[in-house]
Amino acid sequence: PFIDRQDIRNAFARSGVWEVTNPQAPSEKVSFRWSAVLPPWVAWRDLVQEFLQAKAALRVGTTVPLKAFKCESLGVPWIEEMETDDELRELSVHDDAWPWPDEDFRFATVDVQKDLFYLVVRAWSKDGNSRLVHWSKPLTWEDVEELRIEYNIKPHLLFIDSAYNAQKVYAACKRFGWTCMRGSKLRDFAHKLKDGANVRRAYSPRVLVDPAIGTKAQGRVRPVSLFHWSNPTVKDVLYNLREGKGASWTALPDSGQEYELQMFSERRKERADKAGQPVYEWHRVGKRANHIWDCECMQVTAAMMARCLETFFTIVEKGQKH
């Protein structure tokens, strides 16, 4: 094994040679890549720590840190291994025995439709394991609140999507103490920690929204909380959890066909970006309803915010210590 010493690192840098990896590239376009193992100002112990954190992230369902480690630290291409099909597969289920000894958090997530709501309740452990508790389609705001109380969920831990009928959602959040959420096309959001470090996460900092905007009471009532969540990142994580490629994620034994169908309501499609590189995006499958899928995405986001998963979804910007 090599020791992380200045003379050894310098010897590595002096003895290295550049290799052509794409002989078909135009002669007027030249690019270079090298591993962070080479520069003497990058400590190997930091690279080892980054790699171990990335491997730990895989155990709870996300490839984001490993992708950053391979592409940004090692300078090697990332190869997507996620399937793009929408074929229905049997979901993992639990024994429906309660109380669950490992439960640390319980969230309700709600998708708003014209005439009804989709509501999902899921229990989470601190290490990212989770169990579906309940799902249903309440008809009124009051029904949603009754279910929150029935399943013993704190008001601010009920997260409701505000993309549709936002003004009524804001009013309901003010009335009942709920929290708003909204999906975003962004892959991550900037956060500044108390120590001044800059990090990027799959959800935004809290945004305060005036529930009375556009009315005479605008600016005179207490604002409600809103969090944006990354559509691409969170859906990638949920996919991995659903496929058993992370922490334990289970449904009820009698979740039903509608729940199962909607959990396979979106799939990833590949397209080429302007540079000709493959980009993967989530798309709805035909006219298949995806409301439960969205509720489960908000569950993943809530788990990140509660730090059941958060540690492994934090990407420290290069040059920062965290």
Label every model-predicted segment.
Residues P1-I3, A13-R14, R33, T63, ...:
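Mg2+-dependent endonuclease catalytic cores in nucleic-acid-processing enzymes, primarily RNase H-like
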Residues F2-S27, T311-V316:
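Short cysteine/histidine-rich metal-coordination sites, predominantly Zn2+-binding motifs
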Residues A13-A108, V120:
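A contiguous, basic/glycine-rich beta-loop/short-helix subdomain that forms a polymer-engagement track
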Residues V30, W34, P39-D46, E50-K55, ...:
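Extracellular low-complexity, Gly/Ser/Thr-rich intrinsically disordered linkers
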Residues D111, L158, C295:
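Hydrophobic, well-ordered secondary-structure elements that form the walls
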Residues V112-L116:
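Short acidic, Gly/Ser-rich segments with clustered Asp/Glu that frequently serve as metal-coordination loops
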Residues A123-D127, F313-V316:
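Active/binding-pocket-proximal capping segment
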Residues M304-H322:
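Acidic two-metal-ion nuclease catalytic site recognized across multiple nuclease folds
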